[in-house]
Amino acid sequence: MTYNQPNNKGFYGQFGGQFVPETLMTAVKQLEEAYVDSKKDPLFQAELKELLKDYVGRENPLYYAKRLTEYAGGAKIYLKREDLNHTGAHKINNALGQVLLAKKMGKNKVIAETGAGQHGVASATAAALFGMECTIYMGEEDVKRQSLNVFRMELLGAKVHSVTDGSRVLKDAVNAALRAWVAQVEDTHYVMGSVLGPHPFPQIVRDYQAVIGQEARAQFLEKENKLPDALVACVGGGSNSMGLFYPFVNDESVAMYGVEAAGLGIDTPHHAATITKGRPGVLHGTLMDVLQDENGQMLEAFSISAGLDYPGIGPEHSYFNAVGRAKYVDITDEEALEGFKILSRTEGIIPALESSHAIAYAVKLAKELGADKSMIVCLSGRGDKDVVQVKERLEAEKEVKK
């Protein structure tokens, strides 16, 4: 059966929808209309395609990781190299599309939330390219963890607003950005960074990120003359994974694995394994799986990776899980650090801590699948932003061992 989600109300099965105050409903409807028009507009599509090619550097390679495959001792591992994009991650695919859409709608300001800083950098980059004003909302904790990315955003002309509410991380940045959008909706577009938020955001972000899977599918067919047996990608909000998964959704022979952050372990309070440990609830304008206590209070998400510590997951992922189209697994901080080191040493590629979760799971899965199988792993970003954090962590561990 051909997949055709979301429905016209923005639901993926029971998940999704538009749970926003009346003050935002007009903006959300306007965005929906503009987006539908842009899909039919050949000039818009041509401009986006040209930017992805000449500015982002697409298409990026599908790389056979021979030494990583040998290390894992099983299935062939191919890496979709989103780390090679301009700005160093998959986030630019979506940011460019949305800022171009904002321009089409006649808006001259953009705002965005960011966790690890990658989406903030991508949004600031796209805003600079189009000469737009840009404000980025970032939790105070993440501002500390990712000071280099904060400087990058400011260098690109963006104002970085440090959010001191709540636990001062990604979910608080989203809250602040949504509040700011309500106040200036006439001339401002909110560049949602993941497959989250009220409809049409999850669909827009999915469609702009689907270039990952479209390229990977064609590249794999060309190299192997068949489809892969499995796809593996890390999941926070879930945009790089949805970008990889969506073009394969009707290929039933292809298994999909979304890798959540298990932090210090899913049996501790310190993790971000939303599908494994969460249940449906409304957060940031959409119904999805969220981490909550028995009274429905939001729980804090925790991960070594600033890009994965979000207490929800895109509604389409919740739907994939509910219908069994994708399987959601988890990797701890320790395992992710090991993945970070393994890829660096076997392939000379330093991955982002987010992507390291996918690498760590891919090594496990390769052993299970066996040598006659193959997989594509989304290498969603490069690790430059994480090198200092990993260095400090490993040095601290050495001290403890002494």
Swiss-Prot record:
Gene3D superfamilies: 3.40.50.1100. SUPFAM superfamilies: Tryptophan synthase beta subunit-like PLP-dependent enzymes. It catalyses: (1S,2R)-1-C-(indol-3-yl)glycerol 3-phosphate + L-serine = D-glyceraldehyde 3-phosphate + L-tryptophan + H2O. Its EC number is 4.2.1.20. Its cofactor is pyridoxal 5'-phosphate. Keywords: Amino-acid biosynthesis, Aromatic amino acid biosynthesis, Lyase, Pyridoxal phosphate, Tryptophan biosynthesis. One of its GO terms (molecular function) is tryptophan synthase activity. It is an enzyme of class 4 (lyase). Transmembrane segments: none annotated. The keyword Iron does not apply. GO terms for cellular component: cytoplasm. It holds the Pfam family PALP. The modification N6-(pyridoxal phosphate)lysine is found at K91. The keyword Amino-acid biosynthesis applies. Pathway: Amino-acid biosynthesis; L-tryptophan biosynthesis; L-tryptophan from chorismate: step 5/5. Tetramer of two alpha and two beta chains. The beta subunit is responsible for the synthesis of L-tryptophan from indole and L-serine. Belongs to the TrpB family. This is Tryptophan synthase beta chain. The gene is trpB.
